[in-house]
């Protein structure tokens, strides 16, 4: 088992990337905020299928958190993250601090309109500006040929795809299927916040999504499936439901009212269980 090279500056990372590319090797990047779990490791393994060298980045990005959100409480543990990356043979861990990413006087924000505006964009207005900015920087800094993101953050994946296309960033973006626990709950760093009772109740989230997706696939009205999913979550003990919506899969435009027809849809959900906000999504139709 070989530990990944750990670097903290863009200059150090680029030295390694230059050497790899001079040797004719492709480079993949897997951006994360740390607190790595099997879902993240599955992204690294997928990246290894598309490139000879893989960089995992760990940076809890302050620009995507609003003042009232969980930036300070977000789980961190670089040593544990490095050990997990060693198990899957990741080549390099880029772990910058905030000053390395945002030097004094930093004044630029990457704004992606359209696909970023509904759902998470409406619930967390600051979020996607921070995401698009840091991901654009990571693409430029790493000069990666390939980037791998999980479909668990589906809207984020679509925002990043739009941003890279619009800015002509020459990186192939690959979406990886959501990694799930045996009971169907999507793996997430925030699952660590759940009590044992909440963790047992959380399975209602994928269950409600599956039921809604099945109802729509059988020709049921989209709006009825959405309402039924909200009711199922509330009955299971979820408090505030930020959204349950079935949207067009690529641009997240609204579908309905009525049946889905020939459209390719995606159900996207965000809801609170105690003090923990869980998100998930699933293909529909």
From Swiss-Prot:
Listed SUPFAM superfamilies: Nucleotidylyl transferase
Main location: cytoplasm
Compartments reported by the entry: Cytoplasm
Entry binding sites for beta-alanine: 64
Active site location: 40
GO BP terms: pantothenate biosynthetic process
Keyword terms: ATP-binding, Cytoplasm, Ligase, Nucleotide-binding, Pantothenate biosynthesis
Cellular component annotations (GO), alphabetically ordered: cytosol
Catalytic activity: (R)-pantoate + beta-alanine + ATP = (R)-pantothenate + AMP + diphosphate + H(+)
Binding site for (R)-pantoate: 64, 156
Enzyme Commission no: 6.3.2.1
Single annotated GO MF: pantoate-beta-alanine ligase activity
Keyword DNA-binding attached: no
Keyword Signal: no
Pathway(s): Cofactor biosynthesis; (R)-pantothenate biosynthesis; (R)-pantothenate from (R)-pantoate and beta-alanine: step 1/1
Ligand binding (ATP): 33-40, 150-153, 179, 187-190
Free-text function comment from the UniProt entry: Catalyzes the condensation of pantoate with beta-alanine in an ATP-dependent reaction via a pantoyl-adenylate intermediate.
Note: The reaction proceeds by a bi uni uni bi ping pong mechanism.
Assembly and binders: Homodimer.
Family the entry assigns: Belongs to the pantothenate synthetase family.
Protein name: Pantothenate synthetase
Gene: panC
């Amino acid at each position: 088992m070989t530990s990944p090279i750990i670097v903290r500056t863009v200059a150090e990372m680029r030295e390694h990337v230059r050497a790899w590319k001079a040797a004719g090797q492709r480079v993949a990047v897997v951006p994360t905020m740390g607190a790595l779990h099997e879902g993240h490791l599955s992204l690294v393994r997928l990246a290894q299928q598309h490139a000879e060298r893989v960089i995992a980045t760990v940076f809890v990005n302050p620009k995507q958190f609003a003042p009232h959100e969980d930036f300070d409480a977000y789980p961190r543990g670089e040593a544990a993250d490095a050990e997990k990356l060693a198990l899957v043979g990741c080549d390099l861990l880029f772990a910058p601090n905030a000053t390395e990413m945002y030097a004094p006087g930093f004044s630029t924000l990457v704004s992606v309109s359209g696909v970023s505006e509904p759902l998470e964009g409406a619930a967390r207005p600051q979020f996607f500006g921070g995401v698009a900015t840091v991901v654009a920087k990571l693409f430029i800094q790493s000069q990666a040929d390939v980037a791998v993101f999980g479909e668990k953050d589906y809207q984020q994946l679509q925002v990043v795809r739009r941003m890279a296309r619009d800015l002509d960033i020459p990186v192939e973006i690959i979406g990886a299927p959501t990694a799930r626990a045996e009971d169907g709950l999507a793996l997430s760093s925030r699952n660590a916040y759940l009590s044992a009772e909440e963790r047992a109740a959380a399975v209602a989230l994928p269950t409600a999504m599956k039921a809604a997706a099945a109802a729509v696939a059988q020709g049921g009205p989209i709006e009825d499936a959405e309402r039924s999913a909200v009711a199922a979550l509330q009955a299971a003990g979820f408090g505030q439901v930020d959204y349950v919506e079935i949207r067009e899969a690529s641009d997240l435009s609204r579908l309905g009212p009525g049946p889905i027809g020939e459209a390719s849809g995606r159900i996207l959900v965000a809801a609170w269980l105690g003090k923990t906000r869980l998100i998930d999504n699933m293909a529909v139709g």
